Amino acid sequence: MEFVLLGFSDIPNLHWMLFSIFLLMYLMILMCNGIIILLIKIHPALQTPMYFFLSNFSLLEICYVTIIIPRMLMDIWTQKGNISLFACATQMCFFLMLGGTECLLLTVMAYDRYVAICKPLQYPLVMNHKVCIQLIIASWTITIPVVIGETCQIFLLPFCGTNTINHFFCDIPPILKLACGNIFVNEITVHVVAVVFITVPFLLIVVSYGKIISNILKLSSARGKAKAFSTCSSHLIVVILFFGAGTITYLQPKPHQFQRMGKLISLFYTILIPTLNPIIYTLRNKDIMVALRKLLAKLLT
């Protein structure tokens, strides 16, 4: 059995423009995240837990978009969207796995900022390199079995009628729409998993930032306040964008009722947000900008 991804076939006149835009954005994501990883690797001032997590986040972003965009570009180029059941399941599994890991990693990054700002004296002990690695491993090991189980549950459903997916990649809502019979249990599972990987992490991040903001307001130094807010604001912007889009997609009452608006929202969190993330982190982060200037100065001399 195979599916057909409709993608953007409803706007054929814009195919080549969309191909050019998405290709440019994909290259920007690869380049910007690659630069962030390189800067953190080679610059001594960036050898801290915060930037260790940021480099892992950048690597996740590269993998996250690579699951979606190259396949989408190929479908636009060939104007065909045929995809086998196995390829569809694999794409969805890896997409959810990487997305879920990003949610947990963003929570870890918020915890890192909480310890750094609210408990600065304990920070070197609490967030040592071993703990950082354990937190990264935990983010992956929690996500992998849950996502594999959910993917198997969805693709064991019987599919009948049309095999066309009104989307540009294999995601849960449009796949559930093709399933036959009662999908109530699957919908409940989707909501439970979404609560675990979206709602709970978001609430933990909100609590962390509530304590961070409360602590920042107690600082007597205006410079200290500005530096603390600058450090945290970029992370908070990314959190709001990413979790907001995820909530709209996976926590709506009927996630399988996924039409044009769902496709636009998916573009937002699969392409637009990953394009903006490196820009947000670099432009609002003085340490990254200083490291970038030093790297450019070395390359130009």
Swiss-Prot record:
<comment type="similarity">
    <text>Belongs to the G-protein coupled receptor 1 family.</text>
</comment>
<keyword id="KW-0807">Transducer</keyword>
<protein>
    <recommendedName>
        <fullName>Olfactory receptor 10AG1</fullName>
    </recommendedName>
</protein>
<dbReference type="GO" id="GO:0005886">
    <property type="term" value="C:plasma membrane"/>
</dbReference>
<dbReference type="InterPro" id="IPR000276">
    <property type="entry name" value="GPCR_Rhodpsn"/>
</dbReference>
<feature type="glycosylation site" description="N-linked (GlcNAc...) asparagine">
    <location>
        <position position="82"/>
    </location>
</feature>
<feature type="transmembrane region" description="Helical; Name=7">
    <location>
        <begin position="263"/>
        <end position="283"/>
    </location>
</feature>
<feature type="topological domain" description="Extracellular">
    <location>
        <begin position="1"/>
        <end position="16"/>
    </location>
</feature>
<feature type="topological domain" description="Cytoplasmic">
    <location>
        <begin position="38"/>
        <end position="45"/>
    </location>
</feature>
<feature type="transmembrane region" description="Helical; Name=5">
    <location>
        <begin position="189"/>
        <end position="208"/>
    </location>
</feature>
<dbReference type="InterPro" id="IPR017452">
    <property type="entry name" value="GPCR_Rhodpsn_7TM"/>
</dbReference>
<dbReference type="Pfam" id="PF13853">
    <property type="entry name" value="7tm_4"/>
</dbReference>
<feature type="topological domain" description="Cytoplasmic">
    <location>
        <begin position="284"/>
        <end position="301"/>
    </location>
</feature>
<feature type="topological domain" description="Extracellular">
    <location>
        <begin position="67"/>
        <end position="90"/>
    </location>
</feature>
<keyword id="KW-1133">Transmembrane helix</keyword>
<feature type="topological domain" description="Cytoplasmic">
    <location>
        <begin position="209"/>
        <end position="228"/>
    </location>
</feature>
<comment type="function">
    <text>Odorant receptor.</text>
</comment>
<keyword id="KW-0552">Olfaction</keyword>
<feature type="topological domain" description="Extracellular">
    <location>
        <begin position="152"/>
        <end position="188"/>
    </location>
</feature>
<dbReference type="GO" id="GO:0004930">
    <property type="term" value="F:G protein-coupled receptor activity"/>
</dbReference>
<keyword id="KW-0812">Transmembrane</keyword>
<dbReference type="GO" id="GO:0004984">
    <property type="term" value="F:olfactory receptor activity"/>
</dbReference>
<keyword id="KW-0472">Membrane</keyword>
<keyword id="KW-1003">Cell membrane</keyword>
<dbReference type="InterPro" id="IPR000725">
    <property type="entry name" value="Olfact_rcpt"/>
</dbReference>
<keyword id="KW-0325">Glycoprotein</keyword>
<keyword id="KW-0675">Receptor</keyword>
<feature type="topological domain" description="Cytoplasmic">
    <location>
        <begin position="112"/>
        <end position="130"/>
    </location>
</feature>
<feature type="topological domain" description="Extracellular">
    <location>
        <begin position="250"/>
        <end position="262"/>
    </location>
</feature>
<keyword id="KW-0716">Sensory transduction</keyword>
<feature type="transmembrane region" description="Helical; Name=2">
    <location>
        <begin position="46"/>
        <end position="66"/>
    </location>
</feature>
<dbReference type="GO" id="GO:0050911">
    <property type="term" value="P:detection of chemical stimulus involved in sensory perception of smell"/>
</dbReference>
<feature type="transmembrane region" description="Helical; Name=4">
    <location>
        <begin position="131"/>
        <end position="151"/>
    </location>
</feature>
<keyword id="KW-1015">Disulfide bond</keyword>
<feature type="transmembrane region" description="Helical; Name=1">
    <location>
        <begin position="17"/>
        <end position="37"/>
    </location>
</feature>
<feature type="transmembrane region" description="Helical; Name=6">
    <location>
        <begin position="229"/>
        <end position="249"/>
    </location>
</feature>
<keyword id="KW-0297">G-protein coupled receptor</keyword>
<feature type="disulfide bond">
    <location>
        <begin position="88"/>
        <end position="180"/>
    </location>
</feature>
<feature type="transmembrane region" description="Helical; Name=3">
    <location>
        <begin position="91"/>
        <end position="111"/>
    </location>
</feature>
